[in-house]
């Protein structure tokens, strides 16, 4: 068995984008619960959730344009975009800039996520009913 070393971290959470920002907000006790904006919650018992806040660089919200083109974003569910963002942050945090193909092939990123792609799962289930 080989040893693994964690050399960099990246975070995209409802509290924000980036390890330092999320950590600062955690220490301050900031809540990320807001009114649901991604869908109409009127059929549910609550209208609040902790969504990833989209925005631009000026408001400390997640700017998807920094991580993926709009053309590519149309092809994937948001959770893929979130993983790309966090993985890119982790590689940059590690200061990892490999020059050789061999080093690129030996690079790995571990991603943790609850569940993703629910919109696509729901859409596909309607097609096959």
Question: Each predicted region: which residue ranges?
Answer:
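Conserved "HGTGT" condensation-loop signature of ketosynthase/thiolase-family condensing enzymes
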Residues: 1-127
């Amino acid at each position: 068995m080989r040893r693994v070393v964690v050399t960099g971290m990246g975070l995209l959470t409802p509290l924000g984008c980036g390890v330092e920002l999320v950590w600062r907000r955690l220490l301050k006790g900031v809540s990320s619960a807001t009114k649901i904006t991604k869908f109409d919650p009127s059929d549910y018992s609550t209208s609040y959730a902790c969504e990833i806040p989209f925005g631009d660089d000026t408001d400390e919200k997640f700017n998807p344009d920094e991580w993926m083109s709009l053309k590519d974003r149309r092809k994937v569910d948001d959770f893929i975009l979130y993983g790309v963002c966090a993985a890119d942050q982790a590689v940059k945090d590690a200061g990892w800039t490999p020059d050789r193909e061999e080093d690129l092939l030996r690079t790995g990123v571990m991603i943790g996520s609850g569940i993703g792609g629910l919109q696509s799962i729901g859409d596909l289930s309607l097609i096959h009913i």
